[in-house]
Amino acid sequence: MIIKADLHMHTCLSPCGDDDMTPYNAVNLAKLLGYDMIAVTDHNSCLNCPAAVRLVVVPGMELCTAEEIHNVCLFPSLDAAKEFSDFVYDKMPDIINRPEIFGEQIITDEKDNIIGYEKRLLTVASDITEGETVKAVSSYGGVCFPAHIDRSSYSLLS
């Protein structure tokens, strides 16, 4: 059996995401393109995962480690992802987002209604090391892998 999947997808919650990149739009585009599965992996957060459950959606996040390596972290359930997200939030610097510079970090429901804005800047490195990431993700029943292997920044080899 062949499954067409995208396991590294951002929504409007991520600072790099456009405001039109809502979970609803991501799911519908994935359906139009014939995907069977997607993983919503916003930067250091899983707050938009609940809004994207109409396709097989793997809850996850793209975690920026203390070494500034980006890892895709995937979890078996939304509850596990939320618990890991709480763990990550405790390990992030308390820097307030500046929407005029980084854009809004939008949280939506499954119908794309805006239900909030993340105030803490999500594009910063956490205090979690690469080694701690693997152990922590595993403790929540998840798996992780490098989001970028050989890029000029935020990758395993840079």
Regions found by a protein language model. Name each.
Residues 1-67:
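An N-terminally biased module of ancient metal coordination in phosphate/nucleic-acid-related enzymes
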Residues 2, 54-158:
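Extended substrate/RNA-proximal surfaces in nucleic-acid metabolism proteins
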